[in-house]
Every structure is written in structure tokens, then in C-alpha cells.
């Protein structure tokens, strides 16, 4: 079990040992703000989606106020996260497209290793840890080099996707995205697929549950506008996979 503090942009993680994306419009607008919280992500195939949705259903039984993996909470593996001036989004899309177009990522075989969660008071944000690979690390480094120059240091909750019924953004989410490049890339990169929210007591109980490794592949890549809990809420741009 590994723990790191979430305060000040540091991610506190407790490992849990244990046991198709529908593509929408190619390009939609971010919610109106001068800065947008973006997530450049690989979207998994049906193998991972099925596992993530099954775990999500279990968490919702424990904590019904959590979120469902649905049309505005997409299962994904974040490769890059940052705050970008909204006016620069077309440039970001163009730079990301150049990099992703070179990658045959749908042929990659990724391994899901275990559950983890991030404690957030009495609840926790759970996910499935994915083994880092040279391909993932190379892709991340190239995206950081290309898109990083467009980023700003921080933002407010206005940079995120919200709804009238979900208006809030945890400050820790803002801190995490602000610190993503220095603190969560390279040797510190921990790729994962978020599965939802549960009580920490329930997530702790999962420590005794076996987790069987499985493999999956990315099916597509997109840029999202982040919502609360680091969810991929608003798909801004879809990239066609290499054929």
C-alpha cells in the first residue's frame, strides 16, 4: 500500500489489492470560460469498459450519491492534464493530433493491475491501476512537450464542466491538474481508469478482495473538459485512430 498526500497538489493514493466508447461529434465547445481544464485521454476498449462499469455499479450500491460511468462520465486513461486558455484550444487540438496520428495505440496491450483509491474525507475516488509502458510514457512526454507551452499555472472552478445539479469542483482536483506535469508524469505517472466514488470504509473492505490482472487496448483518443473528481465530462475533440 502506498500513500502520498493530496494537499498542495500531491496525490494521496491507497492501493487496493484485489480481485464501446460511443464517439460523439468530432468537436464541441467548452463551457464558456477564459481557461479550460483539459484531459487528453485514451479511451479503452469494451474489455476495460465492462470491468469499470461493473465496479462502478458496485460502488453506487454503497454510495448512491456518486456518479455513474455514462455519456458524461467516460472511462478513460488520462495521459495529459492541464489548464489551457480557451482561445488556444484549436492549437492544442492541432498539436495533439500530430502526435496521436503517428501512434498505433489501438494495437497496444495494456495491463490492469489492481484497484486504488484517493481518500477525500469520508469518501474515496476509486480506480483501476494500469501498468505504465514505454509507449504510454513516450506518448505522455511528447504531449507534454507539444501542449505544455500552452498551459497556465492554475485556474478556478469556472474552467471545469459543471451542471446546475453538480456545480462544485473539489479544490484538490484543481490542485491535482495544476501539478500534473511536474508531479504525475514520467517516473511518477500512474495511469488508471477511474471507476467511481465509495465510502472509505467500503473501499477499505475491498483490500481483501482478489484482483485478477487483465489486458485491454485503447480504442480511441479524445480531449475532454474535466469535471469534478477528474471525470471526463465534456468531449471537446475526437481523434481518428491510425489505420
Where do the PLM segments sit?
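Basic, often amphipathic N-terminal segments
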Residues: 23-120, 133-222, 226-228, 232-243
Amino acid at each position: 500500500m502506498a500513500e502520498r498526500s493530496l494537499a498542495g497538489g500531491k496525490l494521496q493514493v491507497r492501493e487496493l489489492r484485489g480481485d464501446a466508447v460511443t464517439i460523439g461529434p468530432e468537436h464541441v465547445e467548452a463551457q464558456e470560460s477564459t481557461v479550460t481544464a483539459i484531459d487528453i485521454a485514451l479511451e479503452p476498449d469494451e474489455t476495460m469498459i465492462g470491468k469499470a462499469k461493473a465496479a462502478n455499479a458496485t460502488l453506487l450500491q454503497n454510495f448512491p450519491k456518486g456518479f455513474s460511468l455514462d455519456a458524461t462520465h467516460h472511462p478513460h486513461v488520462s495521459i495529459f492534464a492541464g489548464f489551457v486558455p480557451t482561445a488556444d484550444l484549436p492549437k492544442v487540438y492541432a498539436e495533439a493530433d500530430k502526435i496521436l496520428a503517428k501512434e498505433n495505440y489501438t494495437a497496444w496491450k495494456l495491463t490492469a493491475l489492481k484497484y486504488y483509491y484517493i481518500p477525500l474525507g469520508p469518501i474515496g475516488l476509486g480506480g483501476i491501476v494500469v501498468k505504465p509502458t514505454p509507449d504510454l510514457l513516450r506518448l505522455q512526454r511528447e504531449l507534454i512537450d507539444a501542449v505544455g507551452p500552452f498551459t497556465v499555472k492554475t485556474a478556478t472552478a469556472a474552467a471545469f464542466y459543471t451542471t446546475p445539479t453538480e456545480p462544485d469542483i473539489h479544490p484538490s482536483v484543481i490542485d491535482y491538474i495544476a501539478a500534473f506535469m511536474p508531479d504525475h508524469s514520467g517516473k511518477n505517472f500512474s495511469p488508471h481508469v477511474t471507476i467511481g466514488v465509495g465510502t472509505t470504509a467500503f473501499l477499505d473492505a475491498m483490500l481483501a478482495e482478489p484482483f485478477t490482472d487483465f489486458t485491454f487496448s485503447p480504442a480511441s483518443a479524445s480531449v475532454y473538459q474535466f469535471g469534478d473528481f477528474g471525470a471526463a465530462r465534456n468531449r471537446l475533440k475526437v481523434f481518428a485512430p491510425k489505420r
